[in-house]
Amino acid sequence: MMKKLIQLSFTVMIIFTILVLGVVANEGLGKPKKQCNEILKQSNCVAAECDSMCVKKRGKGAGYCSPSKKCYCYYHCP
């Protein structure tokens, strides 16, 4: 009788652990955040300067110079 109780308790504990890990992993993934962008400079883009302006303005943004030499700042929408 005691052996079956320990086995049942162990099984319940394993199932509970798997469920908790699944919920935690799902929360970590979350929904992908929407990406926004804005033009910071219309011409003569310099990559380092563009990235610096973007980080200064948006915090976790990333600056990118387009082939037409515009400076775009990409960031997660608020």
From Swiss-Prot:
Classification via InterPro entries: DEFL
A Pfam family (short name) is SLR1-BP
Where does this one sit in the cell? Secreted
Q: Which GO terms describe its cellular component?
A: extracellular region
Cysteine disulfide partners in this protein: 36-77, 45-65, 50-71, 54-73
Q: Where is the signal peptide?
A: 1-25
Question: Quick one: a GO biological-process term for this protein?
Answer: killing of cells of another organism
What domain of life does the native source organism fall in? Answer: Eukaryota
Q: Does the UniProt entry include the keyword Signal?
A: yes
Q: Which family does it belong to?
A: Belongs to the DEFL family.
Q: What is this protein called in UniProt?
A: Defensin-like protein 149
Whose protein is this, by species? Arabidopsis thaliana
